[in-house]
Amino acid sequence: GKMYIVNMINNFKGILVQEYDPEKECLVGEAKNVFLGTGRGYTEGPHIYHIGEYYYLLMAEGGTGYEHMVTMARSRSIWGPYEEDPGNPVLTSDVDNPEKLQKCGHADLVCTQNGEWYMVHLCGRPPKGSRQCVLGRETAIQKMVWNEEGWLRLACGGRFGQWETEESTGIQEYLFPEEEGKDYGKEDFDLEIADSAGNNETAKNADIAETLSKT
């Protein structure tokens, strides 16, 4: 199959698609603006998934604040034309309920070995009575299902991100092998470094390297 690069055009002017040649390690052919956005503004963070007979375009829109959202469109060709999901936004936030996840948007999809679909996305959790997300941008996950019309929907219904989601069934935990660590010593560091005054810092850095090797 072919490979493509998909990205936002500067200043949110659309979604650009161009073919990528993995052997030459470069872009080839003409770049095309395949989608201008849904009109909600700040269209960015695009992903394209070839699922069944459609190419699904997943986007972040609305900005990264409380109007953040996930929208979708689809086409039978990667080059478009793309039709907007009539149920957009697929995911957003209930800004009138501060106890819920806020700023939900900028998502990605994963399908498990059992064919279950999940969406990972950015969000914020402001303390009750505040609109300041002191932990910054966090990551959440939602279980998804496909409706009869072939559009992706939250398994819990609606379009608001939930604190908890249904776990995947029958998936075994994957344990990553533990690689043997390396002990770093003086010989691993370039100690010939001069300070801002031009003085050689060899002795000082040697002491630092010696300390690191003992930790």
Provide a role label for each language-model segment.
Residues G1-T215:
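Carbohydrate-active catalytic/glycan-binding domains of CAZyme proteins
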